[in-house]
Curated annotation (Swiss-Prot):
Annotated protein name in UniProt: Crossover junction endodeoxyribonuclease RuvC
Alphabetical GO biological process terms: DNA recombination; DNA repair
Catalytic activity line of the entry: Endonucleolytic cleavage at a junction such as a reciprocal single-stranded crossover between two homologous DNA duplexes (Holliday junction)
GO CC term, one of those recorded: cytoplasm
Gene source species: Thermodesulfovibrio yellowstonii (strain ATCC 51303 / DSM 11347 / YP87)
Assembly description: Homodimer which binds Holliday junction (HJ) DNA. The HJ becomes 2-fold symmetrical on binding to RuvC with unstacked arms; it has a different conformation from HJ DNA in complex with RuvA. In the full resolvosome a probable DNA-RuvA(4)-RuvB(12)-RuvC(2) complex forms which resolves the HJ.
MF terms in GO: crossover junction DNA endonuclease activity; DNA binding; magnesium ion binding
Amino acid sequence: MTVIGIDPGSRHFGYGIVDAKQMKLIHANTINLSHDISLPYRLKSIYEILLSMVEKYSPDEMAVEKIFVGKKITSSFVLGYARAIAFLVAAQKEIPVYEYSSTEIKKALTGYGRAHKVQVKSMVYNFLHIDKKISYDCADALAVAICHINSKTNFM
């Protein structure tokens, strides 16, 4: 089984594909888009790239980080648009989608739901035996995938 993890964002959209059986990194990247590009065109780019990755790697399941609504409500709405793109791609390819909160993800990887980004990234490197540098957005996406794999393993 392969899982694609998604760390949604309209400017930095992380995704990572993991082989659940071998707990091995298949592919990960960050879609980096300029703030100068209007939102509809950033979303279009995310859609096209994510769709091509899903078509290329055929993940069995998708795991997406839930939205945390903070002080900037507008940012949460924009984040919601990026999540909607991931959901659309999943629906088009009939891939089941699972959602996890930031706290759930951190707890699954570090044992502590309020862990710092550096700790989460370090655990992603350890779980997947990564020897190359990856962005925080990639690490977060891979963390969502690992969280999902762990949740399925613990309940099977």
